[in-house]
Regions:
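C-terminal catalytic domains of large/alpha subunits in multi-subunit enzymes
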Residues: 1-273
Length: 273
């Protein structure tokens, strides 16, 4: 949209049929915007250059005299001279009555495959405040703050959603999602009635502060947004629980830390004193 100076709602994203498309390995690994986003950005830039070249040829001016604005290619000093992208597509499709530079291939399209020279993971710091009831072992997350740097934010709302979902998952890792096995190494938790997950009441309002440090490894300056949402959570939540239980001399080296386990650790620590 930015390269072609058009509104996002003028762009149609066609879902690929995996039965006929080239091999793809998924949109995971914090690389979707980095790889696909930059590929689209560069391809749109090539389409933009084609539009400028065709318009310059049609109007008999230099390419630097053409601008792309409002979804049109037009002469800067004479805005009445315009070509729509439809006009340009017709010209590049060899339509009658329209001409293009002799050495220019037909087709108003571009194919670009961008591969970054290195990984572009995001950076983040998580801070959490918890309250622990030493009698019941219950843990309440009072406040959760994240400072996150995913580079240039193309869609801040999507990044925040990614962070919120990751934090909810991480809270499950820290406090709920226990996988137990019997003496024969068989899982004793085999359904979602027994495998606890955090609900909306267990996930606090998450305060997100964005820091945008553009990546130097790609044209858009973007970074991933996946890992920093979930990876720090269990560590910071359990560390906060341990800090709250400092008067009891409790040390925690496991996850998840359930209410039953908290009571056991408090009792064990008290007995050892």
């Amino acid at each position: 949209a930015e390269q072609l100076a058009i509104a996002p709602n003028q762009i149609t994203v066609v879902t690929v049929d995996t039965a006929s498309s080239p091999i793809g390995i998924g949109a995971y690994g914090s690389r979707n915007m980095v790889n696909a986003g930059n590929s689209v950005h560069l391809a749109a830039g090539e389409v933009r250059d084609k539009a400028i070249r065709v318009a310059a040829h049609v109007f008999g001016v230099e390419e630097k005299a053409i601008e792309i604005a409002d979804g049109l290619a037009r002469v800067k000093d004479d805005p009445a001279k315009t070509l729509t992208f439809g006009d340009i597509a017709k010209a590049l499709g060899a339509a009658k009555g329209l001409s293009i530079p002799k050495d220019m291939p037909i087709g108003f399209e571009a194919t670009v495959n961008f591969k970054p020279p290195d990984v572009t993971y995001c950076n983040a710091s998580h801070v959490v405040e918890v309250e622990v009831d030493p009698e019941t072992g219950g843990v309440e997350i009072v406040r959760y703050v994240v400072v996150n740097d995913s580079g240039v934010l193309i869609n801040p709302t999507l990044v925040e959603g990614q962070l919120q979902g990751g934090i909810a998952h991480g809270i499950g890792n820290a406090l709920y999602e226990w996988m137990g096995y019997d003496e024969n190494s068989q899982p004793v938790i085999t359904n979602f009635a027994e495998y606890l997950l955090p609900t909306s009441t267990a996930v606090p309002n998450i305060e997100i502060i964005h820091v945008e440090t553009p990546s130097t490894l790609n044209p858009l300056g973007v970074k991933g947004a996946g890992e920093a949402g979930v990876i720090p959570v269990a560590g910071v939540v359990i560390s906060a629980v341990e800090n709250a239980l400092e008067p009891f001399g409790v040390w925690i080296g496991e996850a998840p830390i359930t209410p039953v386990r908290i009571i056991e650790l408090i009792e064990a620590s008290s007995a050892a004193r």
